[in-house]
Amino acid sequence: MGSRFLILIFAFISLCYSQNEINIKNLAIIENIYFVKDSKKPFSGSAFSFSKLTREKILEFQIIDGKKNGIYSEWYINGKKKSKYNYQNNLKHGRYTTYYQNGKKKEKGFWKHGKNEGLCTYWFENGQRKKEGIYKSTKGVGLWSYWYPNGNIEREGYRNNGIKNGFWVYFYDIGVKKSKGNYFDDFKYGLWTFWYTNGNKQSEGYYKKDKKNSLWTNWYANKQKREVGLYIDNKEDGEWIYMSENGEKILSGYFNKGKKVKTWSHWYSGSRKKKQIEYNEGIIISELCWDKIGEIISCL
């Protein structure tokens, strides 16, 4: 129905207004209606504009009874097409395409009565896809995909009413998975997992409304555990244990709402104690230190 309407508009314009052309500088816009300057009658016909530098046409569109109706075209000053839209009663309606100056496509999609509607695809200037997804009344819905300029997938997931809802997965530009998890109303929720560029797991735990709320485990790139501890509302809480890259415990202690409390113990390799510090709400109360043979030394 929409395409037939546009065809009828174009035919009407061609028959009735092919001889009625005007430079846009001779038009006035009053309450979004085009008039010939010093005229009270809405203009109908073809409006155009030329580049002051090259004298090449850079704009042309059709007007019926003062409103944009039909094809709306733009060109770069080098003569290459910049965009092509369709209008219906001053609103973008129907298929559109925009281009980079090098002639490659920039965007392609649809408008419906002034709002993005349906599948829309975006490209980088090198011709690689940039992102693609479906709009409903200008808001993203369903599966959306994003790419790096090198053509590798960057992220992919679901939107509802324009915001992230559902499963999303992210990748490094080399094609290796970076992270995955779920969103609810644009906030991270539930289990999230992160990876290093070598494919080994980096960290894992649960989110609640974008805040870490669970036991979280972090790993070194060589797969050895790095640290384990609890988060409550994105703040460390309870006992935390830290390990070296070879798997030995090197530090442990307690947090309360993100502040160090109680006893914190440091170890040399081989489980020999190195330092012991007492904290109260993040403030050091006392400390003891040992050398590598177990003798008490001054803490510097």
Tell what function each PLM region has.
Residues 1-2:
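N-terminal secretory signal peptides that target proteins for export/translocation
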